[in-house]
Protein backbone atom coordinates (compact mmCIF):
# COMPACT_ATOMS: atom_id res chain seq x y z
CA UNK A 1 0.00 0.00 0.00
CA UNK A 2 1.28 3.45 -0.89
CA UNK A 3 1.27 5.59 2.28
CA UNK A 4 0.74 8.76 0.27
CA UNK A 5 -2.78 7.60 -0.56
CA UNK A 6 -3.72 7.07 3.09
CA UNK A 7 -6.29 9.61 4.28
CA UNK A 8 -7.19 9.94 7.94
CA UNK A 9 -10.44 11.68 8.77
CA UNK A 10 -9.88 13.85 11.84
CA UNK A 11 -12.67 16.41 11.48
CA UNK A 12 -15.07 14.54 13.77
CA UNK A 13 -12.55 14.24 16.60
CA UNK A 14 -12.56 16.57 19.57
CA UNK A 15 -10.23 19.57 19.42
CA UNK A 16 -9.16 21.81 22.28
CA UNK A 17 -7.19 25.04 21.92
CA UNK A 18 -4.87 26.16 24.72
CA UNK A 19 -2.95 29.38 25.30
CA UNK A 20 0.15 29.66 27.48
CA UNK A 21 3.18 31.86 27.83
CA UNK A 22 5.49 28.81 27.79
CA UNK A 23 4.78 25.38 26.30
CA UNK A 24 7.16 22.63 27.37
CA UNK A 25 7.21 19.40 25.36
CA UNK A 26 8.45 16.53 27.50
CA UNK A 27 7.74 15.75 31.14
CA UNK A 28 11.07 14.26 32.13
CA UNK A 29 13.02 15.72 35.05
CA UNK A 30 14.22 18.61 32.89
CA UNK A 31 10.71 19.41 31.68
CA UNK A 32 9.29 19.19 35.20
CA UNK A 33 12.06 21.44 36.55
CA UNK A 34 11.60 24.01 33.79
CA UNK A 35 7.82 24.02 34.26
CA UNK A 36 8.01 24.42 38.04
CA UNK A 37 10.69 27.10 37.83
CA UNK A 38 8.75 29.20 35.29
CA UNK A 39 5.37 28.70 36.96
CA UNK A 40 6.71 29.77 40.35
CA UNK A 41 7.78 33.02 38.72
CA UNK A 42 4.26 33.69 37.46
CA UNK A 43 4.55 32.25 33.94
CA UNK A 44 1.50 30.38 32.62
CA UNK A 45 2.93 27.00 31.53
CA UNK A 46 1.51 24.09 29.56
CA UNK A 47 3.48 20.85 30.02
CA UNK A 48 2.85 18.20 27.34
CA UNK A 49 4.05 14.65 28.10
CA UNK A 50 3.56 11.70 25.75
CA UNK A 51 3.49 9.10 28.53
CA UNK A 52 0.98 8.45 31.35
CA UNK A 53 3.54 9.41 34.02
CA UNK A 54 6.04 12.19 34.52
CA UNK A 55 9.75 11.71 35.07
CA UNK A 56 11.04 10.29 31.79
CA UNK A 57 13.80 7.78 32.53
CA UNK A 58 13.31 8.42 36.26
CA UNK A 59 9.68 7.23 36.11
CA UNK A 60 8.28 3.81 37.00
CA UNK A 61 8.32 2.95 33.28
CA UNK A 62 12.13 3.03 33.02
CA UNK A 63 13.12 2.90 36.72
CA UNK A 64 16.33 4.91 36.68
CA UNK A 65 16.74 6.89 39.89
CA UNK A 66 18.25 10.36 39.75
CA UNK A 67 22.01 9.83 39.47
CA UNK A 68 23.52 13.26 38.90
CA UNK A 69 26.02 14.61 41.40
CA UNK A 70 26.84 11.64 43.60
CA UNK A 71 29.71 11.19 45.97
CA UNK A 72 30.60 11.74 49.61
CA UNK A 73 29.86 15.49 49.61
CA UNK A 74 28.04 15.88 46.28
CA UNK A 75 24.31 16.12 45.67
CA UNK A 76 21.76 17.58 43.31
CA UNK A 77 20.30 20.94 44.31
CA UNK A 78 17.34 23.07 43.37
CA UNK A 79 14.12 21.52 42.14
CA UNK A 80 15.69 18.07 41.69
CA UNK A 81 16.74 18.12 45.35
CA UNK A 82 13.25 19.29 46.31
CA UNK A 83 11.72 16.32 44.45
CA UNK A 84 14.19 13.87 45.99
CA UNK A 85 13.57 15.19 49.52
CA UNK A 86 9.80 14.96 49.06
CA UNK A 87 10.28 11.41 47.79
CA UNK A 88 12.34 10.41 50.84
CA UNK A 89 9.62 11.80 53.11
CA UNK A 90 6.64 10.25 51.28
CA UNK A 91 8.33 7.15 49.93
CA UNK A 92 10.86 5.70 52.41
CA UNK A 93 10.69 2.26 50.74
CA UNK A 94 11.56 3.82 47.35
CA UNK A 95 8.57 2.42 45.46
CA UNK A 96 8.62 3.68 41.87
CA UNK A 97 4.86 4.22 41.61
CA UNK A 98 4.97 6.46 44.69
CA UNK A 99 7.86 8.38 43.11
CA UNK A 100 5.61 8.91 40.07
CA UNK A 101 2.94 10.38 42.33
CA UNK A 102 5.48 12.65 44.06
CA UNK A 103 6.48 14.16 40.70
CA UNK A 104 2.84 14.39 39.56
CA UNK A 105 1.85 16.00 42.87
CA UNK A 106 4.51 18.71 42.63
CA UNK A 107 3.33 19.64 39.14
CA UNK A 108 -0.37 19.53 40.04
CA UNK A 109 0.17 21.71 43.16
CA UNK A 110 1.29 24.54 40.94
CA UNK A 111 -1.71 26.60 39.71
CA UNK A 112 0.26 28.08 36.78
CA UNK A 113 0.86 24.67 35.16
CA UNK A 114 -1.60 22.93 32.86
CA UNK A 115 -0.59 19.28 32.38
CA UNK A 116 -1.41 17.13 29.35
CA UNK A 117 -0.43 13.49 29.91
CA UNK A 118 -0.59 10.84 27.15
CA UNK A 119 -0.34 13.66 24.61
CA UNK A 120 2.21 13.25 21.80
CA UNK A 121 3.35 16.39 20.01
CA UNK A 122 2.87 15.60 16.32
CA UNK A 123 2.97 18.94 14.52
CA UNK A 124 4.30 22.48 14.79
CA UNK A 125 3.12 25.59 12.99
CA UNK A 126 5.80 28.19 12.30
CA UNK A 127 5.83 31.78 11.14
CA UNK A 128 8.49 33.94 9.54
CA UNK A 129 9.24 37.13 11.43
CA UNK A 130 9.97 40.48 9.69
CA UNK A 131 13.71 39.97 10.27
CA UNK A 132 13.57 36.58 8.50
CA UNK A 133 13.78 34.48 11.66
CA UNK A 134 11.40 31.54 11.89
CA UNK A 135 9.63 30.87 15.17
CA UNK A 136 7.18 28.26 16.40
CA UNK A 137 3.67 29.68 16.62
CA UNK A 138 1.79 26.63 17.87
CA UNK A 139 2.13 22.90 18.40
CA UNK A 140 -0.49 20.19 18.10
CA UNK A 141 -0.60 17.08 20.21
CA UNK A 142 -2.69 13.91 19.97
CA UNK A 143 -4.02 12.59 23.27
CA UNK A 144 -4.77 8.93 22.65
CA UNK A 145 -6.60 8.33 25.95
CA UNK A 146 -9.26 10.94 25.13
CA UNK A 147 -9.09 10.89 21.32
CA UNK A 148 -8.51 14.63 21.41
CA UNK A 149 -6.33 16.98 19.39
CA UNK A 150 -4.73 19.71 21.55
CA UNK A 151 -3.36 22.84 19.88
CA UNK A 152 -1.16 25.05 22.03
CA UNK A 153 -0.31 28.62 21.16
CA UNK A 154 2.46 30.14 23.23
CA UNK A 155 5.00 32.92 23.21
CA UNK A 156 7.83 30.49 24.01
CA UNK A 157 8.36 26.77 23.41
CA UNK A 158 10.81 24.31 24.92
CA UNK A 159 11.38 20.75 23.72
Where do the PLM segments sit?
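Short beta-strand segments that buttress and anchor functional surface loops
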Residues: 138-143
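Core beta-strand elements of the Rossmann-like FAD/NAD(P) dinucleotide-binding domain
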Residues: 18-20, 146-156
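Glycine-rich loop(s) and the adjacent beta-strand/alpha-helix scaffold that form part
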Residues: 159
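Alpha-helix N-cap/helix-initiation motif
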Residues: 27-28, 51, 92, 147-150
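Beta1/beta-strand and adjacent pyrophosphate-binding region of the FAD-binding site
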Residues: 14-28
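N-terminal Rossmann-fold NAD(P) dinucleotide-binding loop
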Residues: 31
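Conserved N-terminal/central alpha/beta ligand/cofactor-binding core
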Residues: 2-4, 9-12, 19, 37, ...
Amino acid sequence: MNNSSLVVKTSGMRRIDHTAELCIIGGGLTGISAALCAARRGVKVLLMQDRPVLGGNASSEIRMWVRGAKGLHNRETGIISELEEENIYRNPTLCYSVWDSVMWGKVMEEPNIELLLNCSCVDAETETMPDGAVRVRSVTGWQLTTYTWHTVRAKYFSD
